Amino acid sequence: MKIGIIGAMEEEVTLLRDKIENRQTLTLGGCEIYTGQLNGTDVALLKSGIGKVAAALGATLLLEHCKPDVIINTGSAGGLASTLKVGDIVVSDEARYHDADVTAFGYEYGQLPGCPAGFKADDKLIAAAEYCIRELNLNAVRGLIVSGDAFINGSVGLAKIRHNFPNAVAVEMEATAIAHVCYNFKVPFVVVRAISDVADQQSHLNFDEFLAVAAKQSTLMVETLVQKLAHG
């Protein structure tokens, strides 16, 4: 099995990259892909860059060049569920765009023409992630993760997301684009991210302060999940 892992930022991939043995680097289209073994399991780790276009481009390059069997999207996210705090884990059961609107033509808010309203994560990957959460004794929430090309930092953007997606547990900038590409390629995916901030007016300050905490927690989760997927 080869496992694809995607993070947007240097801070989100550096701890995992340092653990990859026999590492080789491919630089293509503004993305970096690191291949090798993580605790004996073949992995391809992508640093995509921030935002939906960068994530979609990188995910496509990763799938085409490395042919992973599954995709794990890792990194940080803004918490929307009331029980979440910095360092907690969110696991996707679905991903949707929060900034797409073609409702004038009868589509659901967040749905693009020719696409489902949301992109469902793989049940087996979700179950494996939840097993790892129990093993690591982490606080986590599973649910809808929404994505858009905006850092949510205040009441207006937050209120709009809560209105359109009242069940969303987290918000970030890449996951749905990655899920969209995986859907088109028919490759199973799951989003496993750690909370770096609560999406409020102080979120930009919290993000800068707690990104390292989120990166450490998400790395722990991904490393454990890779082991679980490879060895059962």
Curated annotation (Swiss-Prot):
A biological process term (GO) from this entry: L-methionine salvage from methylthioadenosine
Cellular component per GO, a single term: cytosol
EC number: 3.2.2.9
Binding site for substrate: G78, I152, M173, E174
A single MF term (Gene Ontology): adenosylhomocysteine nucleosidase activity
Pathway the protein takes part in: Amino-acid biosynthesis; L-methionine biosynthesis via salvage pathway; S-methyl-5-thio-alpha-D-ribose 1-phosphate from S-methyl-5'-thioadenosine (hydrolase route): step 1/2
Catalytic activity annotation: S-adenosyl-L-homocysteine + H2O = S-(5-deoxy-D-ribos-5-yl)-L-homocysteine + adenine; S-methyl-5'-thioadenosine + H2O = 5-(methylsulfanyl)-D-ribose + adenine; 5'-deoxyadenosine + H2O = 5-deoxy-D-ribose + adenine
Active site positions: E12 (proton acceptor), D197 (proton donor)
EC class of the enzyme, as a word: hydrolase
Keywords: Amino-acid biosynthesis, Hydrolase, Methionine biosynthesis
Subunit structure: Homodimer.
Described function: Catalyzes the irreversible cleavage of the glycosidic bond in both 5'-methylthioadenosine (MTA) and S-adenosylhomocysteine (SAH/AdoHcy) to adenine and the corresponding thioribose, 5'-methylthioribose and S-ribosylhomocysteine, respectively. Also cleaves 5'-deoxyadenosine, a toxic by-product of radical S-adenosylmethionine (SAM) enzymes, into 5-deoxyribose and adenine. Thus, is required for in vivo function of the radical SAM enzymes biotin synthase and lipoic acid synthase, that are inhibited by 5'-deoxyadenosine accumulation.
HAMAP family listed in its UniProt record: Salvage_MtnN
Entry-linked NCBIfam families: MTA_SAH-Nsdase (TIGR01704), PRK05584.1 (NF004079)
Protein family according to the UniProt entry: Belongs to the PNP/UDP phosphorylase family. MtnN subfamily.
Protein name (Swiss-Prot/TrEMBL): 5'-methylthioadenosine/S-adenosylhomocysteine nucleosidase
Gene: mtnN
